[in-house]
Amino acid sequence: MQTTDWIVVGNGIAGAALSYQLAKQGQSVLLIDDANPDSATRYSYGGIAYWSGTDAISRALMVAGIERHRTLSEELGAETEFRELDLLLTIPAGADVDAASQPYDKFEIPPRFVSPADACELEPQLDKGAIAGALTVKHGHVHPTKLVAAFNHAFRQMGGRHLISSVTGLVRVGDKVTGVTTPSQAYVGNRVAIATGGYTRRILQSINIHVPIYHTHAEVVDVSQVDQVDTKIRALIMPAIADRFEAEAKASDPEVEPLWQNGPHQILPPILDAGVVQFQDGFTRIGQISRFNTAVELEVNAAASAAKMRQAIAQQMPVLSAVSGTWHRCLVTFSRDGLPLLGPVPDLSGLHLFSGFTSPFAMLLPVAQRFAAWATGTPDPLIDKMQVSRFV
């Protein structure tokens, strides 16, 4: 049976980028892709918040990340649809503008406040009377699935093996993981990297391994070209007053860790952050509801959720009031400290994590590049700071 240097499980942005970078380092790589349509990469906005660094690590990674995105289509030989557009963080009418703006002062490039009239110059579909203004900054953007497809294309061009199959388990011999099983056969690898985002905890729990990695259930409404809005939406719209990051901090607090290990439990009530982005082909995505529940499978009233998201964005953008669209959901991963969980799982050789990215489109690309170099012998203190062992 053929043994590869690395088996990478998961083909979202994390697995696609990691498999490509490992192959560039001369490693033999098997990428296993379950082709699950409900992935966080597929249903993301595709935004690149390169302006949002708050410390030396995040600033350096986001600068490196946006530089990678600007040249990536040429490098990979396939289009990612990278562009820069205006991000508008809208402030609802009647809200305290100063209070809404203050949390953004910490960022490397703080978004600037604009009046309702100026916001409507940037995005004519906004209802001027519905907002007290907005914070705006230039924001990177890619087509998420085309980005993954571009990585996969370049990976296969270098001889990487891309298998469409689910992974049913990890092959474990004592304290060593030696491969994975699929419905048809087992595959052997010197090292296995789990890049499965919100499904990572479930995979690890199946072998009685517990690490502090978490997920939300994110919901969006996709408006297809058949169902398309007639008018172009120029900007990416998101709320300036958003509770998701504070909620993630509460949901990952060590005091609630037992709930994650003995679920299912609702950790916090759902959060609705009204937003919308239109891709270059006119496809439109409306979002988003985040549910903080430890279950991987969750029963949701899809019609009611979709209606709430459409109504919320239509209050600011009446052009969207009549669209229908299709409701989707996915698991979105996050960690306790905002940094990803990388590297070897303690006390179990052969198994690595590459998951838990809070801002994957902004910082994952340079992290994948550095991780692949680190994994093949190049010391990197930044990768050391992201290792799973920091929580053990």
Language-model segments: residues:
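N-terminal Rossmann-like FAD-binding beta1-loop-alpha1 element of flavoenzymes
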Residues: 4-30
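Short hydrophobic core segments
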Residues: 7-9, 187-199, 368
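Active-site substrate-recognition segment that forms the wall
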Residues: 20-21, 48, 80-82, 198-327, ...
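Glycine-rich FAD pyrophosphate-binding loop
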Residues: 24-42
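Dinucleotide-binding Rossmann-like beta1-alpha1 core, especially the glycine-rich loop
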Residues: 46-122, 271-274
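Short beta-strand to alpha-helix junction loop
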Residues: 60-63, 89-97, 134-153, 299-305, ...
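Flavin (FAD/FMN) cofactor-binding core of flavoprotein oxidoreductases
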Residues: 118-121, 141, 293-295, 299-374, ...
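Helical element adjacent to the flavin cofactor pocket in flavoenzyme catalytic cores
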Residues: 134-183, 187-190
